[in-house]
């Protein structure tokens, strides 16, 4: 009878007013990886890698791009007559060169240090064409032309920035010399060339002199040239060749030239101004767009606040960092599956909560209560906001930690330096792999911390409610408290908002607890009496068995008793 009373009384505790601590769950299928787990279900994630791009070359903060159209940049610089559209002064934030552009150096030959010239020219933000020399007073014939350099309108022509000087009729080409002083407010790129005829006949026809000497000097340049006469393979109808050169004339410096033949003389130079991104994008298909962007990649424009992108490793402006990863997902919500086992690197355990609540939509953590007035659910805004703030800080933290300037720049090398180019590409690839590994490791660590902090947040909220209730409630062991006094909705609200006064309900709770303890005491006494009776009965049975064994042994002689006096 006593045992029945105990069970009935304990069962009645289910009728107590109850408040439970829980967390949000939903039907999200998002998963994240952590340092120690793969594909962990979470309520919400944020993709950190931008994969979308607008396939266009857009204006940037430094201005519009310059599209070279049918021309290579060296053709623009030296003034290929089919590139006259670029003769006007122009500016750019970056340059777009089409790999299939047909117009390069029209008269066959090579440009010395072409890659460096491309870099120096493209690094400026604009140029202004400056006339350096007027050859009208020289005893030469000016403005030589070639059928290799036809103009857009048809007919023979020649480069617009350099002048092909030949002998003066009837048959004169003496030494001529000139000088130019750079009084502009910046550096000037100047250009010249040397003509190498295919035979002596053409040499004397053009320059009279079989042996010529040309010199170009500045404060830092002192070069002399003689023609290398001889036939070459026919290119663009020419067996002759031209070597093309360039230099930089700094402010206040003097450029001097002297020649008696074979000099393709400097006529116009380029006054470079400002700084651009210094990039020449080579792409065949992406058009110039009527658009603006903060981030321009070689593959298109990106407008994204994400910290990473995998569109292109070459980019300009305020861009996400490039990583060779298709996806890096950051947990910005809670673990979305119930768990009853310890987990995490930081010791937080929320396994005492049986599972999340799908009905909680206005917060991450909160309360569910039941009393005589019904049931209710409410979010705890304070703990939710603190968790959201931490998530925001995590995103900023990732951006800050990855905010070291890193990008792969196209390195252009001459034929002789192809091995250097190959080594450079391998180094770039290794750096990219390391960068991607660092980014992934950082995200894994932040995900681990987020989920562990979630466990800790639930535990902290549980402990805070436990402190508020003090001895006025019983821990039900599953994230819930059975309250040992009547607690209406107003009372429940005070527990949730932290204004609950446990002393106000202390007497009622003590009385209820004493009833529970009394029932437990009676139950314990009953069990103790039963234990004593059982022990005594077992001892008597054992004694009877031992005595019976002795008597049986003495009767059959197997056991003797000897008494010694």
UniProtKB/Swiss-Prot annotation:
Disulfide bonds join 20-480, 58-291, 71-83, 106-149, 295-319, 487-491. A lipid is attached at residues 561, 564 (S-palmitoyl cysteine). One of its GO terms (biological process) is virion attachment to host cell. Its main location: virion. The keyword DNA repair does not apply. The keyword Ribonucleoprotein does not apply. Residues 17-528 are extracellular. The record marks 343-344 as: Cleavage. The chain crosses the membrane at residues 529-549. One of its GO terms (molecular function) is host cell surface receptor binding. It holds the Pfam family Hemagglutinin. It is a single-pass type I membrane protein. Residues 550-565 are cytoplasmic. GO terms for cellular component: host cell plasma membrane; membrane; viral envelope; virion membrane. SUPFAM superfamilies: Influenza hemagglutinin (stalk) (SSF58064), Viral protein domain (SSF49818). InterPro entries: Capsid_hemagglutn, Hemagglutn_HA1_a/b_dom_sf, Hemagglutn_influenz_A, Hemagglutn_influenz_A/B. Glycans are attached at residues 26-27, 139, 150, 222, 303, 310, 497, 524. Homotrimer of disulfide-linked HA1-HA2. Major glycoprotein, comprises over 80% of the envelope proteins present in virus particle. The extent of infection into host organism is determined by HA. Influenza viruses bud from the apical surface of polarized epithelial cells (e.g. bronchial epithelial cells) into lumen of lungs and are therefore usually pneumotropic. The reason is that HA is cleaved by tryptase clara which is restricted to lungs. However, HAs of H5 and H7 pantropic avian viruses subtypes can be cleaved by furin and subtilisin-type enzymes, allowing the virus to grow in other organs than lungs. HAMAP family: INFV_HEMA. Belongs to the influenza viruses hemagglutinin family. Binds to sialic acid-containing receptors on the cell surface, bringing about the attachment of the virus particle to the cell. This attachment induces virion internalization of about two third of the virus particles through clathrin-dependent endocytosis and about one third through a clathrin- and caveolin-independent pathway. Plays a major role in the determination of host range restriction and virulence. Class I viral fusion protein. Binds to sialic acid-containing receptors on the cell surface, bringing about the attachment of the virus particle to the cell. This attachment induces virion internalization either through clathrin-dependent endocytosis or through clathrin- and caveolin-independent pathway. Plays a major role in the determination of host range restriction and virulence. Class I viral fusion protein. Responsible for penetration of the virus into the cell cytoplasm by mediating the fusion of the membrane of the endocytosed virus particle with the endosomal membrane. This is Hemagglutinin. It comes from Influenza A virus (strain A/Turkey/Ontario/6118/1968 H8N4). The gene is HA.
């Amino acid at each position: 009878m006593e045992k029945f009373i105990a069970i009935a009384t304990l069962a009645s505790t289910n009728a107590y007013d109850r408040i439970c601590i829980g967390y949000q769950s939903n039907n999200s299928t998002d998963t994240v990886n952590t340092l120690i787990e793969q594909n962990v279900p979470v309520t919400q994630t944020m993709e950190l890698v931008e994969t979308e791009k607008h396939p266009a070359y857009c204006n940037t903060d430094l201005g519009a791009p310059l599209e070279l159209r049918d021309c290579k940049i060296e053709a623009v610089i030296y003034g290929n007559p089919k590139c006259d559209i670029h003769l006007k002064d122009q500016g750019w934030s970056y340059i777009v060169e089409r790999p299939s552009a047909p117009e390069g150096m029209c008269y066959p030959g090579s440009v010395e240090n072409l890659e460096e010239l491309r870099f120096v020219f493209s690094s400026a933000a604009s140029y202004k064409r400056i006339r350096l020399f007027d050859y009208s007073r020289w005893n030469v014939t000016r403005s030589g032309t070639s059928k290799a350099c036809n103009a857009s309108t048809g007919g023979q022509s020649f480069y617009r920035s350099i002048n092909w000087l030949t002998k003066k009729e009837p048959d004169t080409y003496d030494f001529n010399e000139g000088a130019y002083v750079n009084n502009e407010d910046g550096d000037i790129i100047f250009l010249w060339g040397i003509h190498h005829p295919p035979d002596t006949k053409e040499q004397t026809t053009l320059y009279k002199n079989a042996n010529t000497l040309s010199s170009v000097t500045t404060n830092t340049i002192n070069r002399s040239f003689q023609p290398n006469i001889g036939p070459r393979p026919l290119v663009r109808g020419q067996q002759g060749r031209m070597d093309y050169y360039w230099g930089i004339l700094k402010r206040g410096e003097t450029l001097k030239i002297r020649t008696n033949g074979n000099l393709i003389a400097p006529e116009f130079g380029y006054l470079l101004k400002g700084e651009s991104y210094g990039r020449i994008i080579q792409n065949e298909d992406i058009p110039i767009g009527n658009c603006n962007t903060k981030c321009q990649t070689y593959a298109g424009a990106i407008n994204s606040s994400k910290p990473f992108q995998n569109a292109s490793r070459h980019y300009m402006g305020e861009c996400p960092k490039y990583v060779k990863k298709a996806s890096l997902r950051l947990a910005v919500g809670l673990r979305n599956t119930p768990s009853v086992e310890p987990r995490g690197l930081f010791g937080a355990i929320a396994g005492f909560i049986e599972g999340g609540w799908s009905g909680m939509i206005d917060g991450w953590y909160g309360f569910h209560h039941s009393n005589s007035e019904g049931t209710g659910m409410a979010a705890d805004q304070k703990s939710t906001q603190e968790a959201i703030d931490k998530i925001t800080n995590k995103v900023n933290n990732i951006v800050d930690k990855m905010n070291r300037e890193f990008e792969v720049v196209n390195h252009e090398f001459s034929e002789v330096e192809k091995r250097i180019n190959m080594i450079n590409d391998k180094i770039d690839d290794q750096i990219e792999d390391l960068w991607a590994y660092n980014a992934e490791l950082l995200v894994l660590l932040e995900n681990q911390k987020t989920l562990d902090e979630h466990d800790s947040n639930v535990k902290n909220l549980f402990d805070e409610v436990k402190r508020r209730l003090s001895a006025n409630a019983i821990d039900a062991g599953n994230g819930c408290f059975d309250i040992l006094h009547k607690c209406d909705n107003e009372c429940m609200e005070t527990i949730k908002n932290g204004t609950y006064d446990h002393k106000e309900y202390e007497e009622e709770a003590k009385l209820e607890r004493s009833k529970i303890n009394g029932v437990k005491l009676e139950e314990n006494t009953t069990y103790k009496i039963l234990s004593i009776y059982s022990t005594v009965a077992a001892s008597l049975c054992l004694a009877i068995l031992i005595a019976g064994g002795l008597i049986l042994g003495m009767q059959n002689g197997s056991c003797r008793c000897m008494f010694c006096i």
